[in-house]
Amino acid sequence: MIADKKNKCPGCKRTDCGGCGIYRKLNTNKQVRIQFPPDFRAEPAQGLGISFDVGTTTLAGMLWDLGNASLLDAETGTNPQAVFGTDVISRLQAAAKEENREKMRKMLTDKLDEMAFQMVKPFIRTGREEEEKATWTDIKKVVIVGNTAMCEILLGIKPEGLLKAPFTPDYKQIRQRKGKSFGFSFLQNADIIVLPPIGGYVGADALAVYHYVNSCEKGKILAVDI
């Protein structure tokens, strides 16, 4: 939508729409600056890491050895929030209600906990109980991406901005804290990093692709999101 002298923006009441973004000129360039944590680098580290892609329908996880960047295992699962609706809009409308939001968030953290355990299970040391528990702390870092709606639900955010134009996310920077404060159990000791969206419904999954492509050798690269 383009604002003109006869058509003021209903959001900021201006014809040049310098504020809310509902109306924008066609030649308007939009830049987003996202600050990554200092340790968010492709450098060797001790322990295990997990990456999750949280989709509306499907959840995907990968277990990594942070020491040599080798893939150890992978796991997929169905997003249990489907009982609240199978499409993004239905899910957001459900999450906008206070009585649903915490249930939906816990459904997701419980499922990701379960997937993490299934991936780590083959590598758990056998023997005394305390030795088995020690492997839980081997999971040092968990990076979570996904579409904007699923990430906001995971963070327990009331997704008001995504339900109306100009579809502005309610979080715009990386969220990082211990798993316990996110509500995780198996992953309670890990550093959880939730990447932010690029903007609107262009989510953290797209940002992850960009971050990876940016680290590749120079050349033409085609990224396809189906």
Label each residue range with its predicted role.
Residues 1-51, 56, 68, 104-127, ...:
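Nucleotide/phosphate-binding catalytic cleft detector across ATP-hydrolyzing
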Residues 58-60:
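Short loop/turn microsegments at loop-to-beta-strand junctions
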Residues 63-102:
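Short glycine-rich, Thr/Ser-proximal phosphate-binding strand/loop in the N-terminal lobe
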Residues 226:
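Segments forming glycine/polar-rich beta-alpha architectures that bind adenosine-containing cofactors
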